[in-house]
Amino acid sequence: MAGALAAANDSTPNGMPASIPELLAMRRAEPDGEFLVTDNERLTFAEADTASLELADALLASGVGKGSRVGILFPNCAQWLISWLAAARIGALTVPLSTFAPGGELGRLLRHTDVQVVLMGQSIAGRDLVDRIQDALPGLTGGEPVIAAPEAPYLRRIYVWPDCDRSWAAPWPSAESVASLACSAENEVGPADDLVVVTTSGTTAQPKSVVHTHGSLVRHAYILARHRGVSSTDRIYSPMPFFWVGGLTMVVLQALSTGAAVLAQDVFEAGSTLALLERERATFISCWAQASQAMADHPDFAKRDLSSVRGGTMLEALPPDRRPREPDLMPNLLGMTETGGPHTMVEVPDTPLPPELRDSFGIPLPGVVQHRIVDPASGVEA
């Protein structure tokens, strides 16, 4: 595993937030702002802060601490955010797990990332995640206080929200009658501490895992948000799952950095997504080309009022002055899991390119990375 932008003595310039505890402290200035809106949930920043603090206390009481590897397996929902924040704010190394992964692949991820504790939901869009864990770990035995799984030898507890009748599932952690130590633990979390293991999609090879520190990923998301002009008045829709770097950096952490709201669903469906965008007055749409095209081709597209949209990747929803005359004049970017998301971006995002910059991927994102072009054989700079 490779750290993307970590350094032994990480420092954060210009007063930028340097860790998840610092981001949460920033959001307390506007506690009532909406953090997440789904088809059936609303979660404010204050609610996420309170709920994750309680879960953090419970995790500490169970033995989770700095460096403990905590897997997160939920759809894009409030409990994903609460669980991830709870583990991250006390210094645990979070391991977001793919809800796309079938049993065999999920088992490999659990073993490869040395997960010790899993926080998970029962299902996603009607598909049973509990059965998938059982498929992933056929040798899973035991129950409280610990479990044993030969396929994932470090795994000791699996917590299923809100409950589960499997013998190996532990009751969801409760903060009742435990010491309140999370705030003290937060004081021990710094920018150089590991925050998250992000696993690649595995499109061209076996999925690989990348470790990012608090300082590297929080700073990256903060700079991205400022460069794109995201603010607390924005409402960002994206079907990108929170467990991949796009959803984590471009959606979850940008919302925490700015106070913007996240609009999300269990699964993408063009008609219901268009209804969500109109109802919740989305301002940014960040999605893959296939999802954009599916919405543009849907019969409801012409009926929906998307006049609130001011930026993003769905050309058909952009205001006329931000819509390029030709598709290849739409600005693009380059990104990698290893760089925590985009590492290039045009100087004025979400606006058409001039013809002389057709197909440009922009410039190295200021304050994030430096680029060099080298001969791959000799290593000599071009």
Model-derived regions: residue spans:
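Conserved structural elements of the adenylate-forming
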Residues: 49-54, 178-179, 191, 210-231, ...
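Conserved AMP-binding/adenylation subdomain of ANL enzymes
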Residues: 218-235, 242-284, 298
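Gly/Ser/Thr-rich phosphate-binding loop
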Residues: 279-287, 291-358, 363-370, 378-379
